[in-house]
Amino acid sequence: MTTRYWALGSAACLLALVHGVPAHGQGDPPATSASASGNTVTFGGQILMRIRTGSGGFTAEQRADQVAQRLIPILSLKNLKPEDVTVTQTRKYQDATISVRGKLLVTVDKGLSQANGNNDPGDLARAWADNLRKVLPEISVQANPNDKQQ
C-alpha cells in the first residue's frame, strides 16, 4: 500500500470520525471515500489534480504522495471557505503555489504546467485552485455550533 493510499485513507477515517456515520435509516453517510491512482490525487471520488511530471528528484507519483500527505491536515481545518484557497505567483511564467489558509498544498512549476497543457504555471494553479474552492469546503471538518472555541 503506498503512502498516498494510506494518507488519503487516514483523511477519510478522520472525516468519518468527526462527522460521524448516521445509523441505519438516517440517510446517506458523508462522502469520505478517498483514493489515488498513480499520479492522480482524488478525494471523495473527485479528481483534485494530476501531477504529470517529477521535480526536485521526486517522481510524479512521489509528488502526488506529498500532496496527499499535505491534504490531511488541511482537511482537518474547520469551516474551510473558497477564499481560504490562494494562489501565489511572483511573475507570469514563474512557479506558482497553492496554499490553504497559509498551508502549502502544491507548487506548480513550468514542467508540470506544460505537461498539463498550460504554458504558465499560474494558469494551471488557478484552474486547480478553482476546483479546490468548490471541493474543499464540502469535505472539510465543520465546526460544532455548540463549541465555544471556534
Regions found by a protein language model. Give the residues of each.
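Core hydrophobic alpha-helical transmembrane segments of single-pass membrane proteins
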Residues: 12-14
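N-terminal targeting peptides and non-cytosolic leader segments immediately upstream
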Residues: 4, 22-150
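Bacterial N-terminal signal peptides that target proteins for export
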Residues: 1-10
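C-terminal segment of classical bacterial N-terminal signal peptides
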Residues: 16-22
